[in-house]
Amino acid sequence: MSDTLRVAGGAVLHPDFTVSDGDVLVDRDAGEIIAVGDTPAGDETVDAAGCLVMPGLVNAHCHVAMTLLRGYADDKQLDAWLQEDIWPAEAELADGDIRAGARLGLVEMIRAGTTAFADMYFEVPEVVDAITEAGLRARVGHGVVTVGKDDADAVADNEEALSVAREFNDAADGRITSAYMPHSLTTVGEEYLREFVAAAREADVPVHFHANETEQEVEPIVDEHGSRPLEYAADVGLLAEDDFLAHGVHTTAGEIELLAESGASVVHCPASNMKLASGMAPVQAMREAGVTVALGTDGAASNNDLDVFDELRDAAMLGKLQTGAADAVPARAAVEMATAGGAAALGFDSGRIEVGANADLAVVDFDAPHLTPVHDHVSHLAYAATGQDVRHTICDGEVLMRDREVLPFDEAAVREQAAQRASELAARAGE
């Protein structure tokens, strides 16, 4: 007899974006949804009265431990921000810092209804420990940089990434999977990119990388290889169906065609792109071409939070601003990118509420002035709701937040430890 959980008394957001009153019944042993609508009682009940039950949000590009650097350096272009502030600070990270930063970020995401994410960083075992403790779903990888390193260090970094991808591809009973994660097309040499591709195809895991984030990133690739970044990526073997890239801000029509033909996905990070003045990704054009587009926060150092509700609102607004068309990236498209689009990009069977899907749910409390009246639930998700409106968060059938109390962690202790470590890190880095 399976152990069941019923999310009862709310309205349910269906895959076709219709909304109806009903319950969601979850098999906690399997971590799956087993009934929607009129359901039998469960062994345990989560009260969703006055709420909308929606798929858990997917943060498809993140550097979760960078919460320690939230507010550390602002109001700079990407290259200066990285070279003058972030990379020197990261060089001073001590043992345990990344675990502490990751735990803080996981608490923040659970609070905001995120149930799955992709994370590119280093000291991945520390991040995996924190994710395992949190109960979230994730695809993880070691972010490799080989350019500017001597051969021995470059080889070691590359080997670390390959090892991490092998070790964590089915961790935490399958909730945690891996990807090969070369940082970008300009920070990883061509021979290492080709090695990544060969290893990824042999292991049947995707590749995740930054691409076309800034104009400054595009120029050296054109100069060195005589091709656009995604043309170069395709030439070295990237852009397979399961691969996913972050940003894609300066992606041309020809590159969009390459993406559509390949089946590779793009993770749009609107807040980070605005804050670093990187530009606006051509999301409407990508979607019209059939490219899967997901949403990501990027790291908290360049955002400066991990609230995917902010991203879906920004995505909808920027789509209109960029095209001059008010119907570009409509509310439904933005919510889809934050749920089913993210799940598709990361290869998870979540992002929708239907029988057989992963039981990853966010219960959004609509009993608030800014969510009243309710003419259209989806409109409110895109244009009015924030992560603070989430009342319960459920991942893999387990309740991670009930009535706004995060259950896997002592939240006060997590915040205190992260604040202390961030202060010590800043002192070492000479802030």
Swiss-Prot record:
Binds 1 zinc ion per subunit. It is an enzyme of class 3 (hydrolase). It catalyses: S-adenosyl-L-homocysteine + H2O + H(+) = S-inosyl-L-homocysteine + NH4(+); S-methyl-5'-thioadenosine + H2O + H(+) = S-methyl-5'-thioinosine + NH4(+). Keywords: Hydrolase, Metal-binding, Zinc. Pfam families: Amidohydro_1. Its EC number is 3.5.4.28, 3.5.4.31. Substrate binds at residues 90, 183, 213, 298. InterPro entries: Amidohydro-rel (IPR006680), Deaminase_MtaD/DadD (IPR023512), Metal-dep_hydrolase_composite (IPR011059), Metal_Hydrolase (IPR032466), MTA/SAH_deaminase (IPR050287). Disulfide bonds: none annotated. Its cofactor is Zn(2+). The keyword Zinc applies. GO terms for molecular function: 5'-methylthioadenosine deaminase activity; metal ion binding; S-adenosylhomocysteine deaminase activity. Zn(2+) binds at residues 61, 63, 210, 298. Belongs to the metallo-dependent hydrolases superfamily. MTA/SAH deaminase family. Catalyzes the deamination of 5-methylthioadenosine and S-adenosyl-L-homocysteine into 5-methylthioinosine and S-inosyl-L-homocysteine, respectively. Is also able to deaminate adenosine. HAMAP family: MTA_SAH_deamin (MF_01281). This is 5-methylthioadenosine/S-adenosylhomocysteine deaminase. It comes from Halobacterium salinarum (strain ATCC 700922 / JCM 11081 / NRC-1) (Halobacterium halobium).
